[in-house]
Regions:
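Acidic/polar, low-complexity intrinsically disordered N-terminal segments immediately downstream
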Residues: 1-133, 275-299, 305-317
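Contiguous, well-ordered beta-strand patches that form the walls/edges
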Residues: 2-57, 124-270
Length: 317
């Protein structure tokens, strides 16, 4: 499955522990019997972690160690070896949607006077409204666009998650496979998996934040909340039938994140004004700015009154 070379332990704790080669185990201890041949030692065997079994083989020489892992297999193979295609989108049929979105809250989106629309309804309308320019005259919705960039997802027997996608943002036109060890998974039970992400990609995204006022505080809070998930895995709920799969982040995960990260940002009038101005200047989303402003201003209260929120993707065989 992969190779690893030893390195001195780092004192820099700013970078979270990587997912590791074995899913669910950022650190693995191997009791080995060394075979000595001159200035080199070798070892081989089989072992297991809480989540998988595997074989290993390695060599040790002065100042270096090389370890190769193979035959990695998850103990819980409920999803192993399955490829799921993104659910086709049909604008005329509400159930025929690749996006799973549930949002229940007492507070709605103010539209006119005292009339409020449920936040779930507004978000679904926004996702289905053709706002994204494709070519000179054509526009598509975010939901439509999703189907053009993501084809399917495979849960491999060794715990890797591999997606078939198009890198449309960089002009990609051909379907390609994501690399292994970018995302891994283990099955916790019949309704939950844990997903282990590459922390370097997440840290890079966080470091791209451009505004200084209060952003650093939010980033620090985000890292404090997300760090355990990077090490221990992101809990992801799923519902599986014979021919369908829904994978989503549930209320237990999302609501604390919304209250800690999104609430303080959207309580800042300067941030809201900045977001609205950005939308007004964007040729694709400018026409939504009028709807977005009251929605953004209402969001702190919406978050406070939220009782259920689920966001994810729907797949079919």
């Amino acid at each position: 499955m992969g190779k690893a070379k030893s390195a001195a332990a780092r004192e820099d704790v700013s970078m979270p522990t990587a997912p590791g080669v074995l899913p669910g185990s950022p650190v693995v201890t191997l009791p080995v019997d060394l075979t000595i041949n001159g200035d080199q030692c070798s070892f081989a065997g089989t072992s297991e972690t809480d989540y998988c079994t595997f074989s290993y083989k390695g060599e040790v020489s002065a100042g270096a160690m090389e370890l190769a892992l193979s035959e990695v297999k998850l103990k819980n193979a409920k999803l192993a070896g399955m490829t799921w295609k993104l659910k086709p989108y049909n604008q005329e049929v509400e159930e025929q949607d690749p996006v799973r979105l549930v949002w229940e809250s007492e507070k709605g989106i103010p539209l006119s006077g005292s009339f409020e629309m449920p936040v779930e309804s507004v978000l679904k309308i926004a996702l289905r409204t053709p706002l994204i320019a494709v070519g000179a005259e054509n526009k598509v919705s975010a939901t439509d666009m999703l189907g053009t960039v993501l084809k399917d997802v495979t849960f491999m027997e060794d715990g890797n998650i591999v997606a078939t996608y198009k890198d449309a943002a960089n002009g990609g036109t051909e379907w390609t496979k994501s690399p292994v060890n970018l995302a891994q998974y283990v099955v916790e039970n019949d309704n939950q998996i844990k997903v282990f992400l590459n922390p370097a990609a997440i840290i890079a995204a966080v470091n791209n934040a451009g505004r200084a006022v209060d952003i650093q505080t939010v980033i620090q809070q985000a890292i404090q909340m997300l760090y355990p998930m990077l090490v221990n895995g992101v809990p992801v709920a799923f519902e599986q039938t014979e021919d369908a799969l829904s994978v989503y982040l549930n209320t237990e995960l999302l609501l604390p994140l919304l209250k800690t990260l999104v609430f303080p940002l959207l309580s800042d009038e300067e941030v809201v004004a900045m977001l609205v101005e950005l939308m007004k200047k964007d040729p694709d989303f400018g026409e939504m700015a009028g709807l977005a402003e009251p929605m953004l201003k209402a969001f702190p209260e919406i978050i406070e009154s939220t009782t259920k929120v689920e966001i994810g993707l729907n797949f079919v065989k």
